Amino acid sequence: MFPMVTEFMNYGQQTVRAARYIGQGFMITLSHANRLPVTIQYPYEKLITSERFRGRIHFEFDKCIACEVCVRVCPIDLPVVDWKLETDIRKKRLLNYSIDFGICIFCGNCVEYCPTNCLSMTEEYELSTYDRHELNYNQIALGRLPMSVIDDYTIRTILNLSEIKT
């Protein structure tokens, strides 16, 4: 008779313990139900990137002196700089400058070490294409400034994640 009573007591304790665990999980679920979602509706809402964000590189053709410092500091020797030596003035003349963003790791070394500041990072990060050859930007494509997220009236901008919660 006593083993049956002890088994019943163990069963009761196990039931109470299981109910407590289920209750704890349910309380956590209810505490998260009051919070707003952290996700944003991406094409229509975008986070404003920080000033130091390393997006697509912007290139100013007129400032470049074809020194090739950007190529030397790039860990993957990515920028392609074509130039011709002008013998009458003894200076290099830039013919072509291109960067393949399919290979670029966006480290920012080229921007940091450029002596004439002809390279800068933009806030553009939507570089996806269906053809990888479209990611090879020449000096004309690199010279175009992207539209700022703040200036685009079709997009609702969100400063940071704390603004989503309020």
Swiss-Prot record:
A Pfam short name: Fer4
Record carries keyword RNA-binding: no
Record key words, sorted: 4Fe-4S, Chloroplast, Iron, Iron-sulfur, Membrane, Metal-binding, NAD, NADP, Plastid, Plastoquinone, Quinone, Repeat, Thylakoid, Translocase
Alphabetical list of InterPro entries matching this protein: 4Fe4S_Fe-S-bd (IPR017896), 4Fe4S_Fe_S_CS (IPR017900), NADH_quinone_OxRdtase_chainI (IPR010226), NDHI (IPR004497)
Enzyme class, broadest EC rank: translocase
Primary site of residence: plastid
Topology term for the membrane: Peripheral membrane protein
Molecular function GO labels: 4 iron, 4 sulfur cluster binding; iron ion binding; NADH dehydrogenase (ubiquinone) activity; quinone binding
Catalyzed reaction equations: a plastoquinone + NADH + (n+1) H(+)(in) = a plastoquinol + NAD(+) + n H(+)(out); a plastoquinone + NADPH + (n+1) H(+)(in) = a plastoquinol + NADP(+) + n H(+)(out)
Residues noted as binding [4Fe-4S] cluster 1 in the record, renumbered to the chain: C64, C67, C70, C114
Cofactor detail note: Binds 2 [4Fe-4S] clusters per subunit.
Keyword Kinase listed: no
All residue ranges annotated as the 4Fe-4S ferredoxin-type domain in the record: 55-84, 95-124
EC number of the protein: 7.1.1.-
Signal peptide range in chain numbering: none
Cellular localisation: Plastid, Chloroplast thylakoid membrane
GO biological process terms, semicolon-separated: photosynthesis, light reaction
Cofactor: [4Fe-4S] cluster
Residues binding [4Fe-4S] cluster 2: C74, C104, C107, C110
Any single Gene Ontology cellular-component annotation: chloroplast thylakoid membrane
Family indicated by similarity: Belongs to the complex I 23 kDa subunit family.
Subunit structure: NDH is composed of at least 16 different subunits, 5 of which are encoded in the nucleus.
Role summary: NDH shuttles electrons from NAD(P)H:plastoquinone, via FMN and iron-sulfur (Fe-S) centers, to quinones in the photosynthetic chain and possibly in a chloroplast respiratory chain. The immediate electron acceptor for the enzyme in this species is believed to be plastoquinone. Couples the redox reaction to proton translocation, and thus conserves the redox energy in a proton gradient.
NCBIfam families: ndhI, NuoI, PRK05888.1-3
Name of this chain's protein: NAD(P)H-quinone oxidoreductase subunit I, chloroplastic
